[in-house]
Amino acid sequence: MIEIIPAIDIIDGKCVRLSQGDYDSKKVYNENPVEVAKEFEANGVRRLHVVDLDGAASHHVVNHRVLEQIATRTSLIVDFGGGVKSDEDLKIAFESGAQMVTGGSVAVKDPELFCHWLEVYGSEKIILGADVKEHKIAVNGWKDESACELFPFLEDYINKGIQKVICTDISCDGMLKGPSIDLYKEMLEKFPNLYLMASGGVSNVDDIIALNEAGVPGVIFGKALYEGHITLKDLRIFL
């Protein structure tokens, strides 16, 4: 069964969502992300994806206090991403209670450092973030496109020991128009042992069912929950 991973995106300490990574499209859903996390936990959710959008924009971890509060006031397994660009950022994330940390831009810009993290912390704790626009990897909070093609990028890191990947199709993210199932199928055909977490575009329970039927191991979503297109009760069949 597919793993359900709600997302909490944070700006100014608040729970927000963007559309296609556009910071100008910010919508605040809750002033208190800890309350959101506690509600998820009360409904059987075990895993949480926390994104520091301030961190992604400013190239260093910013909202670690929110992470710390979520980690201490719930028993959710938290993976954290956004602005993790240095050893110090990684240390802050783990010390603040993240069980796993996602690196995206750093894996493109400083592969030596990212591989060092993989060696030190292992593939259980380090997740590769592959944010994709037309099969190219995007960096810096999705503001810039790199020259990295998705499949060679993945193959390189899988050969170096990566096992967990969060793949976000930027064109779908926050648009509630359905996920890129064909892309994820293609990824799993090429890399059948990959623990792939699909992110972006989930609009209803049928999308999650379709991802599950496609063999996708995990799904990350937020806006569909916050907008009421999916209820926590709907998710019980997966939990």
UniProtKB/Swiss-Prot annotation:
What SUPFAM superfamilies does the annotation carry? Ribulose-phoshate binding barrel
- Please tell me whether the keyword Amino-acid biosynthesis is annotated for this protein: yes
Localisation: Cytoplasm
* One Gene Ontology MF term: 1-(5-phosphoribosyl)-5-[(5-phosphoribosylamino)methylideneamino]imidazole-4-carboxamide isomerase activity
- Give yes or no: UniProt keyword Lipoprotein: no
NCBIfam families, alphabetized: 1-(5-phosphoribosyl)-5-[(5-phosphoribosylamino)methylideneamino]imidazole-4-carboxamide isomerase
> How is this protein named in the record?
1-(5-phosphoribosyl)-5-[(5-phosphoribosylamino)methylideneamino] imidazole-4-carboxamide isomerase
Which organism does this record belong to?
Bacteroides thetaiotaomicron (strain ATCC 29148 / DSM 2079 / JCM 5827 / CCUG 10774 / NCTC 10582 / VPI-5482 / E50)
